[in-house]
A protein has these predicted regions:
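Alpha-helical membrane segments of multi-pass proteins
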Residues: 15-298
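N-terminal secretory/membrane targeting signals
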Residues: 1-19
Length: 298
């Protein structure tokens, strides 16, 4: 039995290497095109190990946070390890789906999972003290407070999204693994900052009403980009011109599908998030009004 399992693992690894030999994945090779890049797998394993060790050590992490973080980590694996990653080298639409998972599924779920506390609990006490002292220093506090300001985080997310979809940069991701990795890292980093600011990161610097506004405006500018990709009569990314035919699509049709993914499903995610925060805002307003009424009666 172990030999059989090992054989299957070696087969999957071999197919993965063949799928990334410089040629775009073909339909008959898709399900074997898993991407076991150590630069992706090792950080995911380390994050999972630290998080669940921290949960075991602390025993105080709410279940809803554990579920959110687990779902976020699994969605990262789906985007970066599953055949979707290899398919993104052949189809722009798959590439867009991958990006939407990173920015609109993984990032908010990881933020809702609040992993910093479990990560700290997983470390030795001496390390925790040193990290605690380091984050309290003025330079670190200043940098963190700056990049997590709602307007700054919103701007970073906007710049990352629009800059990387400029043809001159996007085309480089199709020919350079390092540029492609930089794109994914910047998308995830910018989205983590944005959702951290939107969900307030635990410090309530921004009310729920402002959170709704930032989500709404982010939804608007991403929808505009999706609409431009969908409605454009011109091909933005010629790098896909010779890779979509095997999948029964022209490059322009593939681009239109990718634009629709950014336009419609992504718009739904922003709408749901905005409605949820709007309901929290109403509850918060009612609570404050009730408190004010009780104070007046006293």
């Amino acid at each position: 039995m172990p030999l059989k399992r090992t054989s299957w693992l070696l087969l999957i690894l071999a197919q993965s290497l063949l799928a990334h030999s410089g040629e775009p994945v073909q339909p008959h090779d898709l399900w074997g095109a898993w991407t076991f890049d150590p630069g992706v797998v090792i950080p995911l394993v380390i994050c999972a190990f630290l998080y669940y060790l921290g949960i075991y050590q602390s025993k105080v992490i709410p279940r809803v946070q554990i579920v959110a973080f687990t779902a976020g980590l699994l969605s990262l694996a789906l985007a970066l390890i599953s055949p979707l990653h290899a398919l993104g080298e052949a189809l722009f639409s798959a590439h867009m789906l991958q990006h939407e998972i990173l920015m609109l599924v993984s990032a908010p779920l990881l933020v809702l999972g609040r992993p910093l506390v479990p990560f700290l609990w997983a470390l030795p006490m001496s390390w925790r003290r040193r990290i605690g002292q380091a984050v309290k220093t003025a330079p670190v506090r200043s940098i963190w407070d700056t990049i997590t300001r709602p307007l700054i985080a919103w701007t970073i997310e906007l710049v990352a999204l629009w800059a990387w979809h400029a043809p001159v940069l996007f085309e480089k991701t199709l020919t350079s693994e390092s540029v492609h990795a930089a794109q994914h890292i910047s998308f995830l980093f910018a989205s983590l900052l944005f959702w951290w600011a939107v969900f307030q990161g635990g410090d309530r610097r921004m009310g729920y009403g402002m959170s709704v506004i930032y989500i709404f405006t982010t939804g608007v500018h991403s929808t505009i980009l999706g609409a431009l990709l969908t409605l454009s009569p011109n091909l933005w990314y010629p790098g896909y011109a010779n890779t979509t035919g095997a999948w029964g699509l022209t490059a322009l049709q593939d681009q239109q599908i990718g634009g629709l993914i950014m336009w419609v499903p992504a718009g739904v995610v922003f709408l749901v998030a905005a409605l949820w925060l709007f309901s929290l805002w109403l509850d918060e307003s009612k609570f404050r009004m009730a408190q004010a009424g009780a104070g007046n009666r006293i």
